From Swiss-Prot:
It holds the Pfam family Hfq. GO terms for cellular component: cytosol. RNA chaperone that binds small regulatory RNA (sRNAs) and mRNAs to facilitate mRNA translational regulation in response to envelope stress, environmental stress and changes in metabolite concentrations. Also binds with high specificity to tRNAs. CDD domains: Hfq. Homohexamer. It comes from Stenotrophomonas maltophilia (strain K279a). GO terms for molecular function: RNA binding. This is RNA-binding protein Hfq. Residues 9-68 form the Sm domain. Gene3D superfamilies: 2.30.30.100. The keyword RNA-binding applies. The gene is hfq. Belongs to the Hfq family.
Length: 91
């Protein structure tokens, strides 16, 4: 597993498990909102009034509506503008 995914998967999984509302900004500037229903190596399934399959290569930023604890002993990822990831932790 690459270093980039050692935080990505636990982060997305925590958002999915806790049903945290997220704003997903795409590289073209479009903002999508909803909850993460599922994800894999290439796509994120975002649910609002409908489900949207969004390719990860099109995603610029994922902003949770509240702080999310990543992994069992991991740090928190802060919500809002300028949030920073906490300590990395694998599940």
């Amino acid at each position: 597993m690459s270093k980039g995914q050692s935080l990505q998967d636990p982060f997305l999984n925590a958002l999915r498990r806790e049903r945290v509302p997220v704003s997903v900004y795409l590289v073209n500037g479009i903002k999508l909102q909803g909850t993460i229903e599922s994800f894999d190596q290439f796509v994120v399934l975002l649910r609002n009034t409908v489900s949207q399959m969004v390719y990860k290569h099109a995603i610029s930023t994922v902003v949770p509506a509240r702080n999310v604890k990543v992994g069992p002993g991991g740090g928190y990822v802060q919500s809002g503008e300028g949030g920073q990831a906490g300590d990395e932790a694998d599940e």
